[in-house]
Amino acid sequence: MAPDKNLVERWKTAEILLLGGSAGSFKILFQIVKLFTPGLNKTVIIVIHRKKNFFSEIEKLFAENSRMMMREIADKDILNKNTIYIAPANYHTLIEKEGTFGLDVSEPVWFSKPSIDVTFESAAEVYKERCIAILLSGANQDGAEGLLKLRNNGATTIAQHPEDAEMDEMPAAAISIGAAEYILHTDEIFKLLST
């Protein structure tokens, strides 16, 4: 099925794409990263629950298959288009109104640091309707409240269909509180991001 025309238009005009996931989301993130080319003209931010040494592993795999620049976020990095940013382990990643990232060492949220909620909520304040956020597979509810705040601030919000998620708790939590404007199967997510 072709993606909703309104959703496609919002994707084309968005400045930033937020991707959040935990257990079971690595495969879909890997496929998403392969879709992007330098002409994307968007900032892509991935927040995934991971261990500290995980970046070198995913960086290698993603870099081999991505045509866009990819880097782990450092404090006060400027958000650039045509770049894929990965939230670092053991920090919460904030998006600041100055167009920079901030790293925060406060307590874990949903037993997670980085927390998807923290990043999504900060993006909601800055990017509002210029943002698209997708919440993927995960084994806890991190990201649901952040997705709701994004939706309430005008962002386009998507949850992976729980039937497709390896771990359905994260997208199901977002759907249950009305945070997901769109609920898309995995192939629909790929089609949207390919347009």
Regions found by a protein language model. Give the residues of each.
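Conserved acid/base catalytic micro-environments in cytosolic active-site loops
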Residues: 1-195
